[in-house]
UniProtKB/Swiss-Prot annotation:
It comes from Klebsiella pneumoniae subsp. pneumoniae (strain ATCC 700721 / MGH 78578). This is Serine hydroxymethyltransferase. The lineage of its organism: Bacteria, Pseudomonadati, Pseudomonadota, Gammaproteobacteria, Enterobacterales. The modification N6-(pyridoxal phosphate)lysine is found at K229. It comes from the Bacteria. PANTHER family: SERINE HYDROXYMETHYLTRANSFERASE.
Amino acid sequence: MLKREMNIADYDAELWQAMEQEKVRQEEHIELIASENYTSPRVMQAQGSQLTNKYAEGYPGKRYYGGCEYVDVVEQLAIDRAKELFGADYANVQPHSGSQANFAVYTALLQPGDTVLGMNLAQGGHLTHGSPVNFSGKLYNIIPYGIDESGKIDYDDMAKQAQEHKPKMIIGGFSAYSGIVDWAKMREIADSIGAYLFVDMAHVAGLIAAGVYPNPVPHAHVVTTTTHKTLAGPRGGLILAKGGSEELYKKLNSAVFPSAQGGPLMHVIAAKAVALKEAMEPEFKVYQQQVAKNAKAMVEVFLNRGYKVVSGGTENHLFLLDLVDKNLTGKEADAALGRANITVNKNSVPNDPKSPFVTSGIRIGSPAVTRRGFKEAEVKELAGWMCDVLDNINDDAVIERVKGKVLDICARFPVYA
């Protein structure tokens, strides 16, 4: 007989120590990586459930294994909630990650060698939008589009590239772009050449669910997202669509299973269902509104302290600091802030003279700090501390002083009570 109340600490002290150290790190560090967030205890409870034991290849009502009557209920709840939350009429909740979801879309809509128009990674795109080191860049002919001198997406250049190269698919979405994307304009460009519009909304899904950022679902042929990041659920992927054909939806389902994956992770799908329900609550909208307010408040401080923000501001949860004028690399800034218990990530900026392993910028996001209760006053104070560190990157006394302030505010705003 298996006893569920057993403690890992009693069995595997070495592993438990690492887990406990990570728990302490999360409580004692300020998390500003834009793609990270804190999920709820309810989500973690679902993800740690006995559903992990069940194989369920196939889809609700059409499984290859017996004993799926209850996991069918779980998956259907997740599907229905995803469709309701984002205004879709199709949802696949099985992708293990956002990259897996994107791979399924490529598989369903394209053939290897087809031409794809995607956002340049160096100007805000994502690995799966055509990076040469990713499957997308290896299997498909990628034509990049980017941003103009003001830091906004260059739709004129996008349209020109579309007419010249006639891609079969245009990708919208980003991993480091702080503006509003005109999904309708992108669909217009796609329609002008008979291309698919595929949107990866992973970074802004939570903002979209709360009505804080424009929803691409009514405009795109297919939309993908992660279920963590701003959505604050478990790590996983999701595919959505509206107004498509049954043939398209069958292709998408087949591209997930059996093409790319086998058995779905039913414990994670249950956790997705919980997170999607949480995203329908009124307090989730308040949270997402605060995420956007906090990002803007931080930008204001950095600009006032003489730092360059790419595109001059933010309309979502993230922004990039361009450190070229400060003669700092992103790697140096990342390390110095880390010594003060502030976690960011180095990030390339437009026309970056440094390699992707060094970079000339850092990416900053507000979802996690907002989740632990920070509002404008706290994030403005935090941004000021960050400027103190970046202004005195080799001054250990300044960094230690900021670290002390970070530890104090983290104690006042715990992640988990």
